[in-house]
Each structure stands twice: as structure tokens, then as C-alpha cells.
Amino acid sequence: MKKTQTWIITCIYLQLLLFNPLVKTKGICGKRVTDDVKDVTKLVANLPKDYKIALKYVPGMDVLPSHCWISVMVEQLSVSLTDLLDKFSNISEGLSNYSIIDKLVKIVDDLVECTEGYSFENVKKAPKSPELRLFTPEEFFRIFNRSIDAFKDLETVASKSSECVVSSTLSPDKDSRVSVTKPFMLPPVAASSLRNDSSSSNRKASNSIGDSNLQWAAMALPAFFSLVIGFAFGALYWKKKQPNLTRTVENIQINEEDNEISMLQEKEREFQEV
């Protein structure tokens, strides 16, 4: 029985070792970026076109590889979005905007935490310090979207030999025209289709609970299947060994009966001799 239990435990540990790498290979920050980034289009449509958003921008971001500026930009985007969130917090008409910005802040904060928690070999410091500039909502969220896209490919985007050097021919005026590259396409969004989010705090709590539940499910399911497969192997091994165990028990019982018969016969002979 001890051998059977040892075999079952061994199967369980083997399955855990086999399945755990599958959970880890989903990416270091695989689920940091959620579908809430799709609401950027609504937010840009809601904000005045001449509204200005302050952002510390890395000079040469349009020409440098993404690994040269991604860590700095996610930090600066977090600061700017948090400031923007504070401006909408006390405006009842802007509850829908507040909810969208709040979700974007959470995404960017998670990306900042990821860049601080893991050492990416390809990520380098920006060649120049970020400069404070004012951007329209369309320009600002184009930078936001580009940073999100760059972060998704952060682990494979650049080689170690890539240089983070801004060309001397790049003028500040040319670099500041962010709207020239990658036009931001805005589908028509009717104001009546935007629903005021009067329960943003409840949604934040439910979203955080949902995210944690998904993470626990991702961890628990492989472990559960590992246990099931381990027990299945153990049961097959036990079933295979069961006939041998039954024969062993029967042999022991037969030997005990033979010994008892021999003892009785011996005592009977001794009694007859007396």
C-alpha cells in the first residue's frame, strides 16, 4: 500500500510540474491590457477638440524604437491620466468620461508596475529627458495607443544592439507634430449613445474582483486537471497491482492455515506419545 501511495503522489507532482509552465508562458504581463482601451474613441469624441492635455513627452519618440521610450512614457501617461481624472471627478455631466479615464489609469498603472517588477533586457533609458508639452485629446491618445501597442510587443520588439540615438537633423518642430503619423480614425459617435456611468465605483470594484477571479481560475484549473490526471494514473497503477495484492493476501492466509494445521498435528502426536 505504501508503494501505491508513493506512486500516486509522484504522479501528482509530475503533473503539477508539467502544467505549471503552461501558466507562466502566457506572458509576463499578459493580461495587463484589457478591452477597456477600446473606449478611447468614445473619450476622444466626448472631449473638446481644442482641449489641451499636459504630458511629458520623450523627444524623438516618433523615430526611436519603442524599447527606448516605453518605460518612461507609461510613467508619464499615468501622471497625465491621473490629472485628467481629477478634473472630471466632481463633474456630474462627465461621469461617463470619468469611468473611461479611470479604467485607462488602472491599465497604465499596471503597466508601470510591470516595468518596475521585471527586468526587460531590451528596454533602455530615453536619450533625452521628457519635455512637458500640451496635446489635443486626439494627439494625446494616439501616443497612448502607440504606447499600449509597443508594450504588447515589448518582449520581442528590439534587439540588444538597437541604438537609442536621435538624429541631429530632427528639429523640435518636426518632432512635435505627432498628428502627422498614423492618423487617428474616429467613427461617428452620437452623444445620445453615451450612457452616464452613475455607478463607476461599483464597476471598479466588480472589475477588480473579476480580474482576480480570472487570475485564480487560470491558476486553479491547471492544478485541478493535474490532480485529476494524477489520481487517474494512481488508480490505474492500483488496479494493475490489485490482483498481485489479492494473491499475496491469499497466500498469507493459506500459509497461516497450514501452520495452524501443522501445530495441531504436532500437539496431537505429543499427546498420543504421552
Curated annotation (Swiss-Prot):
Residues 239-274 are cytoplasmic. The chain crosses the membrane at residues 216-238. A soluble form is produced by proteolytic processing of the extracellular domain. Glycans are attached at residues 90, 97, 145, 196. Its main location: cytoplasm. SUPFAM superfamilies: 4-helical cytokines. GO terms for biological process: cell adhesion; ectopic germ cell programmed cell death; embryonic hemopoiesis; extrinsic apoptotic signaling pathway in absence of ligand; hematopoietic progenitor cell differentiation; male gonad development; mast cell apoptotic process; mast cell migration. Disulfide bonds join 29-114, 68-164. It holds the Pfam family SCF. Keywords: Cell adhesion, Cell membrane, Cell projection, Cytoplasm, Cytoskeleton, Disulfide bond, Glycoprotein, Growth factor, Membrane, Secreted, Signal, Transmembrane, Transmembrane helix. GO terms for cellular component: cytoplasm; cytoskeleton; extracellular space; filopodium; lamellipodium; plasma membrane. It is a single-pass type I membrane protein. It comes from the Eukaryota. Belongs to the SCF family. Homodimer, non-covalently linked. Stimulates the proliferation of mast cells. Able to augment the proliferation of both myeloid and lymphoid hematopoietic progenitors in bone marrow culture. Also mediates cell-cell adhesion. Acts synergistically with other cytokines, probably interleukins. This is Kit ligand. It comes from Canis lupus familiaris (Dog).
